[in-house]
């Protein structure tokens, strides 16, 4: 889940400490399923860089001043400019860079990663967002984080998590999601023995979808040569995915399961994936997460989640591309309706053949293209999807002795009433990454990272003193709930605490209202209404959680892979057919209108 971005210099709601000069890495090649021919006039591919194993996160950056790039009627300096360095943007950028595209990533803050970043305080290294890392195994085709790192010669040491999450639910229902699938099924069926066949049926369908996805080479679904090639190679797998594309997890679950409490448990499973219940969660998204946790397992990177983005950024530079920090993009420049560049807050301009926005679609079309008429397809997107709520987040350091020796790393707490699952402050998600990696905290200490849904409307308009008082009050009530349910004496064991609100997330993540991402207005037709990477504006692409397939680490990495492939085709680094492109993109656009 995406949480407040706190940079290495200041944190929470303190003023951001600006630098007088932009910082950047002039960072180089490999590939992630991109094996198509490149233009003949491109230089020969460089060798895959020596694999670098990353063991820890450092907040150091390389500082330099970079001047804006102006067009003089000649070729644009860059093949692609990526706005933002979240995981989706970095995967897209690195995948283009390994094909020897010239890429510039522009990041508003001091470090890469966005909600997958980190910050350091008083000897602690805190993950900004989720510590549950999917797509980080050493096998299959859905280990997209591992593949993305490998593509730029990077490998991170990881620690396997034996339990994905420990659920603490109403009616004293306690369920551990064990790494081994058989152990998980055994535990769940022991709680619901009368639903054993239903449990096997629902999760069996999840495996059908996961195995189909995992058998395919993952590229852009908007590129017809690839798409038709995959269909002819794997027709049954493609038809399976097409069958489930418009379906939701809750509807599938109800085909197999009748017990209302078990269905509520599946709602909680999906809520972690999508911040909505199972009836609103696309079956494909649910299946990716509910199976990858057993297939490849949850693996935590040594030194913290922030090392992923840092390693991708360094790998990008190794490929000869660039990433600039303190580069706040304020607008996208259009020339006769085509996206040709970006303008920064300090007035500098950069130009490229293509622009890739890692901002949300609301921020892209509502702010970066402010004043432009909203394209019809974006109007349709906003009819189907709304902004999900944001989060209240609490980063704490506590005395180690307050946690029992057998404490799991991740917990989901909903104590009293299933109806509170989606309510503000109703559910609590807790990560304790020091259970896996003690190096993140001083000796004798643990990190507790707590978050719960909250809307920005609950925090707007408050004077500073009232705002700070409310943060402390809400945080205290959340901590008291955990103290009562899990860890007696928790409040008195706290040695460090910082609280972030939706206002914090809006400021540091540059996300409208601090939103977690898109969620459907009603019951969606699976993923049918979710837009891909191309947009109605020539030369402009979107990447991240407001693109297919949506929210989550695997999903945004997949979005980055797809975006890079489509852009590569459009700038001549992959095969393409203009005739087939027009037909496929038209068909996909029409299908989205059915959602």
From Swiss-Prot:
Pfam families: Amino_oxidase (PF01593). Keywords: Acetylation, Carotenoid biosynthesis, Chloroplast, FAD, Flavoprotein, Isomerase, Membrane, NAD, NADP, Plastid, Transit peptide. GO terms for molecular function: carotenoid isomerase activity; oxidoreductase activity. It comes from the Eukaryota. The keyword RNA-binding does not apply. One of its GO terms (biological process) is etioplast organization. Its cofactor is NAD(+); NADP(+); FAD. The keyword Flavoprotein applies. The modification N-acetylvaline is found at residue 57. Belongs to the carotenoid/retinoid oxidoreductase family. CrtISO subfamily. This is Prolycopene isomerase, chloroplastic.
